[in-house]
Protein backbone atom coordinates (compact mmCIF):
# COMPACT_ATOMS: atom_id res chain seq x y z
CA UNK A 1 0.00 0.00 0.00
CA UNK A 2 1.25 3.50 -0.85
CA UNK A 3 2.49 5.35 2.27
CA UNK A 4 0.05 8.23 1.75
CA UNK A 5 -2.89 5.83 1.56
CA UNK A 6 -1.62 3.94 4.61
CA UNK A 7 -1.82 7.11 6.69
CA UNK A 8 -5.32 7.83 5.44
CA UNK A 9 -6.56 4.38 6.39
CA UNK A 10 -4.99 4.80 9.85
CA UNK A 11 -6.64 8.21 10.19
CA UNK A 12 -10.01 6.66 9.33
CA UNK A 13 -9.65 3.84 11.85
CA UNK A 14 -8.45 6.24 14.56
CA UNK A 15 -11.40 8.55 14.00
CA UNK A 16 -13.74 5.56 14.09
CA UNK A 17 -12.25 4.69 17.48
CA UNK A 18 -12.94 8.24 18.66
CA UNK A 19 -16.48 8.09 17.26
CA UNK A 20 -17.21 4.89 19.15
CA UNK A 21 -15.62 6.23 22.33
CA UNK A 22 -17.72 9.41 22.34
CA UNK A 23 -20.82 7.56 21.17
CA UNK A 24 -20.97 5.09 24.04
CA UNK A 25 -19.77 7.68 26.55
CA UNK A 26 -22.80 9.79 25.66
CA UNK A 27 -25.13 6.81 26.08
CA UNK A 28 -23.86 5.58 29.44
CA UNK A 29 -23.28 8.99 31.02
CA UNK A 30 -26.24 10.98 29.71
CA UNK A 31 -29.54 9.08 29.88
CA UNK A 32 -28.98 6.80 26.88
CA UNK A 33 -28.65 9.70 24.42
CA UNK A 34 -26.59 9.04 21.30
CA UNK A 35 -24.91 12.34 20.54
CA UNK A 36 -23.32 11.27 17.25
CA UNK A 37 -26.59 11.34 15.30
CA UNK A 38 -29.87 13.22 15.19
CA UNK A 39 -32.48 10.51 14.61
CA UNK A 40 -33.28 9.91 18.29
CA UNK A 41 -33.09 13.64 19.04
CA UNK A 42 -35.55 14.51 16.26
CA UNK A 43 -37.95 11.83 17.48
CA UNK A 44 -37.60 13.37 20.93
CA UNK A 45 -38.57 16.76 19.48
CA UNK A 46 -41.75 15.23 18.04
CA UNK A 47 -42.54 13.48 21.33
CA UNK A 48 -42.01 16.64 23.38
CA UNK A 49 -44.03 18.73 20.94
CA UNK A 50 -47.04 16.42 21.05
CA UNK A 51 -46.64 15.95 24.80
CA UNK A 52 -46.35 19.73 25.24
CA UNK A 53 -43.06 19.44 27.07
CA UNK A 54 -41.82 22.62 25.47
CA UNK A 55 -38.82 23.21 27.73
CA UNK A 56 -37.25 19.87 26.82
CA UNK A 57 -38.25 20.37 23.20
CA UNK A 58 -36.33 23.65 23.05
CA UNK A 59 -33.21 21.96 24.45
CA UNK A 60 -33.48 19.31 21.73
CA UNK A 61 -34.04 21.95 19.06
CA UNK A 62 -30.86 23.60 20.35
CA UNK A 63 -29.01 20.31 19.83
CA UNK A 64 -30.43 20.11 16.30
CA UNK A 65 -29.30 23.64 15.45
CA UNK A 66 -25.82 22.96 16.83
CA UNK A 67 -25.57 19.81 14.70
CA UNK A 68 -26.68 21.72 11.60
CA UNK A 69 -24.27 24.57 12.37
CA UNK A 70 -21.36 22.12 12.38
CA UNK A 71 -22.38 20.78 8.97
CA UNK A 72 -22.76 24.31 7.60
CA UNK A 73 -19.29 25.30 8.82
CA UNK A 74 -17.65 22.38 7.03
CA UNK A 75 -19.01 23.87 3.81
CA UNK A 76 -18.41 27.54 4.65
CA UNK A 77 -14.86 27.39 6.06
CA UNK A 78 -13.15 25.91 2.95
CA UNK A 79 -14.76 28.63 0.84
CA UNK A 80 -13.21 31.41 2.95
CA UNK A 81 -10.01 29.97 4.46
CA UNK A 82 -7.18 27.77 3.20
CA UNK A 83 -6.57 25.95 6.50
CA UNK A 84 -6.66 22.15 6.56
CA UNK A 85 -10.16 21.39 7.83
CA UNK A 86 -8.93 18.12 9.32
CA UNK A 87 -6.86 19.94 11.95
CA UNK A 88 -9.82 22.14 12.81
CA UNK A 89 -12.02 19.07 13.23
CA UNK A 90 -9.57 17.30 15.54
CA UNK A 91 -9.13 20.54 17.49
CA UNK A 92 -12.89 20.64 18.00
CA UNK A 93 -12.83 17.00 19.12
CA UNK A 94 -10.11 17.76 21.66
CA UNK A 95 -11.97 20.80 23.01
CA UNK A 96 -15.20 18.78 23.27
CA UNK A 97 -13.43 15.95 25.10
CA UNK A 98 -11.96 18.39 27.61
CA UNK A 99 -15.34 20.05 28.23
CA UNK A 100 -17.25 16.80 28.69
CA UNK A 101 -15.12 15.75 31.64
CA UNK A 102 -15.97 18.94 33.55
CA UNK A 103 -19.74 18.92 33.11
CA UNK A 104 -21.58 17.89 36.32
CA UNK A 105 -23.61 14.70 36.30
CA UNK A 106 -26.79 16.49 37.36
CA UNK A 107 -27.12 18.83 34.39
CA UNK A 108 -29.53 18.30 31.50
CA UNK A 109 -28.32 15.29 29.47
CA UNK A 110 -29.13 17.06 26.20
CA UNK A 111 -27.21 20.21 27.12
CA UNK A 112 -24.30 18.14 28.45
CA UNK A 113 -23.95 16.59 25.00
CA UNK A 114 -23.95 19.87 23.06
CA UNK A 115 -20.17 19.53 22.46
CA UNK A 116 -20.72 16.06 20.98
CA UNK A 117 -23.60 17.33 18.84
CA UNK A 118 -21.12 19.79 17.33
CA UNK A 119 -17.89 17.79 17.17
CA UNK A 120 -19.22 14.59 15.63
CA UNK A 121 -21.02 16.02 12.57
CA UNK A 122 -18.01 18.28 11.95
CA UNK A 123 -15.80 15.18 11.95
CA UNK A 124 -18.28 13.27 9.79
CA UNK A 125 -18.39 15.94 7.09
CA UNK A 126 -14.66 16.68 7.18
CA UNK A 127 -13.12 13.25 6.79
CA UNK A 128 -13.86 11.22 3.69
CA UNK A 129 -13.14 7.52 3.78
CA UNK A 130 -9.97 6.47 1.93
CA UNK A 131 -9.85 4.30 -1.15
CA UNK A 132 -13.15 5.57 -2.50
CA UNK A 133 -15.21 3.80 0.15
CA UNK A 134 -18.37 5.32 1.61
CA UNK A 135 -17.90 5.04 5.35
CA UNK A 136 -18.75 7.13 8.40
CA UNK A 137 -16.56 7.32 11.49
CA UNK A 138 -19.36 8.31 13.88
CA UNK A 139 -22.02 5.61 13.45
CA UNK A 140 -22.18 2.05 12.19
CA UNK A 141 -25.39 1.23 10.30
CA UNK A 142 -24.03 1.79 6.79
CA UNK A 143 -20.69 0.25 7.72
CA UNK A 144 -22.48 -2.87 8.90
CA UNK A 145 -24.53 -3.02 5.70
CA UNK A 146 -21.46 -2.61 3.51
CA UNK A 147 -19.53 -5.22 5.49
CA UNK A 148 -22.39 -7.71 5.26
CA UNK A 149 -22.92 -7.27 1.52
CA UNK A 150 -19.17 -7.45 0.82
CA UNK A 151 -18.80 -10.68 2.79
CA UNK A 152 -21.85 -12.16 1.07
CA UNK A 153 -20.61 -11.24 -2.40
CA UNK A 154 -17.13 -12.56 -1.64
CA UNK A 155 -18.53 -15.90 -0.45
CA UNK A 156 -20.68 -16.18 -3.57
CA UNK A 157 -18.22 -14.92 -6.21
CA UNK A 158 -14.77 -15.18 -4.56
CA UNK A 159 -14.10 -11.60 -5.70
CA UNK A 160 -10.87 -10.25 -4.19
CA UNK A 161 -12.16 -6.67 -4.43
CA UNK A 162 -15.08 -7.61 -2.19
CA UNK A 163 -12.62 -9.24 0.20
CA UNK A 164 -10.70 -5.94 0.46
CA UNK A 165 -13.96 -4.11 0.96
CA UNK A 166 -15.03 -6.48 3.73
CA UNK A 167 -11.67 -6.04 5.46
CA UNK A 168 -11.99 -2.25 5.35
CA UNK A 169 -15.51 -2.15 6.77
CA UNK A 170 -14.67 -4.89 9.26
CA UNK A 171 -11.71 -2.87 10.56
CA UNK A 172 -13.89 0.23 10.73
CA UNK A 173 -16.51 -1.60 12.80
CA UNK A 174 -13.82 -3.13 15.01
CA UNK A 175 -12.18 0.27 15.61
CA UNK A 176 -15.52 1.92 16.42
CA UNK A 177 -16.61 -0.74 18.90
CA UNK A 178 -13.17 -1.08 20.48
CA UNK A 179 -13.40 2.62 21.26
CA UNK A 180 -16.91 2.08 22.64
CA UNK A 181 -15.75 -0.80 24.85
CA UNK A 182 -12.82 1.17 26.26
CA UNK A 183 -15.13 4.13 26.86
CA UNK A 184 -17.44 1.98 28.99
CA UNK A 185 -14.55 0.50 30.97
CA UNK A 186 -13.11 3.95 31.70
CA UNK A 187 -16.53 5.34 32.62
CA UNK A 188 -17.08 2.46 35.07
CA UNK A 189 -13.68 3.03 36.69
CA UNK A 190 -13.19 6.80 36.42
CA UNK A 191 -16.68 8.25 36.00
CA UNK A 192 -17.22 11.27 33.78
CA UNK A 193 -13.51 12.08 33.68
CA UNK A 194 -12.92 8.81 31.84
CA UNK A 195 -13.64 10.73 28.65
CA UNK A 196 -10.21 12.36 28.89
CA UNK A 197 -8.39 9.19 27.82
CA UNK A 198 -9.88 9.85 24.39
CA UNK A 199 -7.35 12.67 24.11
CA UNK A 200 -4.71 10.03 23.32
CA UNK A 201 -6.23 8.88 20.00
CA UNK A 202 -7.17 12.48 19.22
CA UNK A 203 -3.55 13.63 19.43
CA UNK A 204 -2.47 10.51 17.56
CA UNK A 205 -4.85 11.60 14.78
CA UNK A 206 -3.13 15.00 14.73
CA UNK A 207 0.22 13.25 14.21
CA UNK A 208 -1.21 11.04 11.46
CA UNK A 209 -2.67 14.03 9.62
CA UNK A 210 0.66 15.86 9.84
CA UNK A 211 2.45 12.79 8.50
CA UNK A 212 -0.09 12.48 5.69
CA UNK A 213 0.43 16.12 4.71
CA UNK A 214 4.20 15.70 4.67
CA UNK A 215 3.95 12.52 2.62
CA UNK A 216 1.57 14.15 0.16
CA UNK A 217 3.95 17.10 -0.22
CA UNK A 218 6.86 14.74 -0.95
CA UNK A 219 4.92 12.56 -3.39
CA UNK A 220 5.31 13.50 -7.08
CA UNK A 221 2.11 14.72 -8.71
CA UNK A 222 2.25 11.91 -11.30
CA UNK A 223 2.29 9.27 -8.55
CA UNK A 224 -0.68 10.85 -6.78
CA UNK A 225 -2.56 11.05 -10.06
CA UNK A 226 -1.90 7.38 -10.76
CA UNK A 227 -3.09 6.39 -7.29
CA UNK A 228 -6.18 8.54 -7.70
CA UNK A 229 -6.96 6.97 -11.07
CA UNK A 230 -6.57 3.51 -9.59
CA UNK A 231 -8.99 4.40 -6.81
CA UNK A 232 -11.48 5.74 -9.35
CA UNK A 233 -11.29 2.55 -11.41
CA UNK A 234 -11.89 0.48 -8.31
CA UNK A 235 -14.88 2.63 -7.38
CA UNK A 236 -16.31 2.07 -10.86
CA UNK A 237 -15.78 -1.65 -10.43
CA UNK A 238 -17.68 -1.61 -7.14
CA UNK A 239 -20.55 0.31 -8.66
CA UNK A 240 -20.86 -2.21 -11.47
CA UNK A 241 -20.81 -5.13 -9.07
CA UNK A 242 -23.31 -3.55 -6.67
CA UNK A 243 -25.71 -2.33 -9.37
Feature annotation, model-predicted:
Residues 1-243:
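Alpha-helical transmembrane segments of multi-pass membrane proteins
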